């Protein structure tokens, strides 16, 4: 893990497909932000394997933005340290459960699936331990386990070309 601090307005390329501003705090007031290079490397690997663009819906969050009513983030959120991203495929071509499986396969420590009317995305972070959760109702986060929730989903199969490619890759890995 290597945390790098960037200034607001910096357009540095973090990888082949990600720029610094994609991970910027959405409060609009922060002058600097932190980004874990391991986070970017793993997301780039997922993007390369899937062959579809990823949309970062939330990257770094300052303390104020993380605690805001719009976000309602945990006080210990990995977003506050630049170690987490909420993301999905650009055109929502892969469901968030499949994205969670892929995130687990590339070695993310924290994986959350958000799948409710206001969101359909995956949270991934670079924590050293393991944590998984599923959120199907806004602001309610029951814990789950890889065995109970994520693993059975991949075995049922999926539809769509991008989902089929993700399934094949994961079946080789699991």
Enumerate the language-model features and the residues they cover:
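Extracytoplasmic cell-surface/polysaccharide-interacting catalytic and binding patches
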Residues: 1-49, 128, 138-174
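Active-site nucleophilic cysteine motif
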Residues: 39, 46, 77, 83-84
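Extended, low-complexity, intrinsically disordered C-terminal regulatory tails
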Residues: 40-72
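Solvent-exposed, flexible loop/coil residues
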Residues: 10, 18, 22, 64, ...
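Generic detector of short, locally flexible boundary/turn motifs and exposed helical patches
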Residues: 19-23, 50-54, 86-91
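N-terminal start-of-chain detector that recognizes signal peptides
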Residues: 27-29, 55-61, 94-98
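Catalytic cores and adjacent binding grooves of peptidoglycan-active enzymes
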Residues: 75-83, 89-174
